[in-house]
């Protein structure tokens, strides 16, 4: 088993941040495994999974020295995958934007014990009306016995105009 350090990063965006993170991790013999980063409202934010030697304090302390970033870490032991008890499904949503839409979607998914593994949302101007349209792409982990048709019906009840599509 490998020790892994899960690091969250947030701070003002600037050129070269990923290079600084990668160089710091490599200098401390960490191995960059997985990551996801975004720029939102001028802020750089994301998460990276790093294989580390020992407890990983050296890697975390070195990362925390990068100016202008709030960096936090959690050490975990990477476990081998257990028997498949869930299915991975992709979901796409489009509808008129309104307050509480993400809460409503998350509530329905939680009701069916469906875990959100990845969530990307954005707004766009409607082609015909110019009204703001809400878009979401989700990767979900659902119990094998969950009725995805029932989940679909419940999601469609959130709003008359919400388009719900399971992706392949």
Predicted region positions:
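A conserved regulatory-domain signal marking ACT and ACT-like small-molecule sensing domains
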Residues: 1-168
């Amino acid at each position: 088993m490998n020790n892994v350090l899960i690091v969250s990063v947030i701070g003002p965006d600037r050129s070269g941040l990923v290079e600084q993170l990668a160089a710091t991790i490599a200098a401390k013999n960490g191995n960059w495994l997985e990551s996801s980063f975004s720029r939102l409202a001028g802020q750089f934010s994301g998460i990276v999974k790093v294989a580390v030697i020992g407890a990983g304090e050296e890697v975390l302390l070195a990362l925390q020295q990068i100016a202008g970033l709030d960096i936090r870490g959690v050490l975990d032991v990477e476990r081998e995958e257990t028997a498949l008890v869930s299915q991975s499904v992709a979901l796409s949503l489009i509808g008129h934007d309104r307050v509480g839409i993400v809460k409503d979607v998350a509530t329905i998914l939680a009701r069916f014990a469906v875990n959100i593994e990845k969530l990307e949302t954005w707004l766009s101007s409607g082609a015909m009306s110019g009204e703001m349209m809400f878009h979401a792409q989700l990767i979900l982990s659902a119990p094998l016995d969950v009725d995805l048709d029932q989940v679909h019906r419940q999601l469609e009840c959130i709003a008359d105009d919400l388009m719900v599509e399971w992706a392949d």
